[in-house]
């Protein structure tokens, strides 16, 4: 879910914090991508006649086709992607995960009813609601990435939190995900729609945290409290407080504690056993990989092993996969050129958003497990 309504709120009250770019604008940029979010998009979008792609054994292959071709497209445009996979979800997320299970069970019932009624559009809608990224999907995508020479990392917990840590450390330019809570975790730059389908023709949206805070007149801790009021994955929000009201309250009272003291409890009842303090702490001090322990490396694709996996096991067209590998190899030769703004510091524009910010005190960092294409060095 991320943060409810945050993207629209920023567009309404801090529009200068957003800019839209074509994918070509990111030539030479390293980007940390929320892998689970991307795989979910591929499972939803890469379909044939409304159904996911499958091989003869009935195994789903939509995620592999999506990962293969979208990654090649990024590389062809000079982007150097590193995929970050989710680790163990924080305990605070258990309530949200339980709600998702309930919604899936309800969607399953509605799907059966739609199938019985022969309502094709309803069947497609509820089928997509049942899409879930599994361990097998993740493992197969990791294997594919390693054969493509693309680095990936295993986060100890939430992928978007570790993506944010990589941006703050200057290891990558931006975090790419549809989950807006990447900003709540402190990512200086967030990119949306990077892995969206080309057919949708969505421009890439770039959100700059420093400009958001400046426009709202908030610091990061106050912004975190605003996000909690809007609604997050980690605790309930106060019913009856909409986005604009939440902004007004935070700007006036500066913290959730002070807001609660001044609210009419009959009109705005606070959730029972409200875990807003724990959620606040989680956003400011998440369990993340240690960016200094990570050395990112993009290497030459292993063509024959890719053919063995994608064509032999997953039954994709050999001609198409070999063509994709050629495109990938060619893109590597062109992406070695750097960006001019990596050498010259430009000030006073969105593109000069801070590349590095200090970690909050007590931030829990762990060394991430790394794929074959990503190597470790000792932390500084």
Swiss-Prot record:
Biased composition (Basic residues): 363-380
Region (Disordered): 327-380
Sites of Symmetric dimethylarginine modification: 19, 100, 104, 192
Annotated residues for binding of Mg(2+) 2: 179, 181, 233
Effect of residue 86 to A: Loss of flap endonuclease activity but substrate binding activity is retained
Keyword Magnesium: yes
Region N-domain, residue ranges: 1-104
GO biological process terms, semicolon-separated: base-excision repair, gap-filling; DNA repair; DNA replication; DNA replication, removal of RNA primer; double-strand break repair; double-strand break repair via homologous recombination; memory; positive regulation of sister chromatid cohesion
Residue sites binding Mg(2+) 1 per the record: 34, 86, 158, 160
One family name in Pfam for this protein: XPG_N
Enzyme Commission code(s) on record: 3.1.-.-
Modification sites for Phosphothreonine: 336, 364
Effect listed in the UniProt record for changing residue 181 to A: Loss of flap endonuclease activity but substrate binding activity is retained
Superkingdom of source: Eukaryota
SMART domains in UniProt: HhH2, XPGI, XPGN
InterPro entries in the record: 5-3_exonuclease_C_sf (IPR036279), Flap_endonuc (IPR023426), HhH2 (IPR008918), PIN-like_dom_sf (IPR029060), XPG-I_dom (IPR006086), XPG/Rad2 (IPR006084), XPG_CS (IPR019974), XPG_DNA_repair_N (IPR006085)
Family, as annotated: Belongs to the XPG/RAD2 endonuclease family. FEN1 subfamily.
Protein name (database record): Flap endonuclease 1
Protein's gene: FEN1
């Amino acid at each position: 879910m991320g943060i409810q309504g945050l993207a629209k709120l920023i567009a309404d009250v801090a529009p200068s914090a957003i800019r839209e770019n074509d994918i070509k604008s990111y030539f030479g940029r390293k980007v940390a991508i929320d892998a689970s979010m991307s795989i979910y998009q591929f499972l939803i979008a890469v379909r044939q006649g409304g159904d996911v792609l499958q091989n003869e054994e009935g195994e789903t292959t939509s995620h592999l086709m999506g990962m293969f071709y979208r990654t090649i497209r990024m590389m062809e445009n000079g982007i150097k992607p590193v995929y970050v996979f989710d680790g163990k979800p924080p305990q605070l997320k258990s309530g949200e995960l339980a709600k998702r299970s309930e919604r899936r069970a309800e969607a399953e019932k509605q799907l059966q009813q739609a199938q019985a009624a022969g309502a094709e559009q309803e069947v497609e809608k509820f089928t997509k609601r049942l899409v879930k990224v599994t361990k097998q999907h993740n493992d197969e995508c990791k294997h594919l990435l390693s054969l493509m020479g693309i680095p990936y990392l295993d986060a100890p917990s939430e992928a978007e939190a570790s993506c944010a840590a990589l941006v703050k450390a200057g290891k990558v330019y931006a975090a790419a995900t549809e989950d807006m809570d990447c900003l709540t975790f402190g990512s200086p730059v967030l990119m949306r729609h990077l892995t969206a389908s080309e057919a949708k023709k969505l421009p890439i949206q770039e959100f700059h945290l420093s400009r958001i805070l400046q426009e709202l007149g908030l610091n990061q801790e106050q912004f975190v409290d605003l996000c909690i009021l809007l609604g997050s994955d980690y605790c309930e929000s106060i019913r009856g407080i909409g986005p604009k009201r939440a902004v007004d309250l935070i700007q006036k009272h500066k913290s959730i504690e002070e807001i609660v003291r001044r609210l009419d409890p009959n009109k705005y009842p606070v959730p029972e056993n409200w875990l807003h303090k724990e959620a606040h702490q989680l956003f400011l001090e998440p369990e993340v990989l240690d960016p200094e322990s990570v050395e990112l490396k993009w290497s030459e694709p292993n063509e024959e092993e890719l053919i063995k996996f994608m064509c032999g096991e997953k039954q994709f067209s050999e001609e198409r996969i070999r063509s994709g590998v050629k495109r990938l190899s060619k893109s590597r030769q062109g992406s070695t050129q750097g960006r001019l703004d990596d050498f010259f510091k430009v000030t006073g524009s969105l593109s000069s958003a801070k590349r590095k910010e200090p970690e909050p005190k007590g931030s829990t960092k762990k060394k991430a497990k790394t794929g074959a294409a990503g190597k470790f060095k000792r932390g500084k």
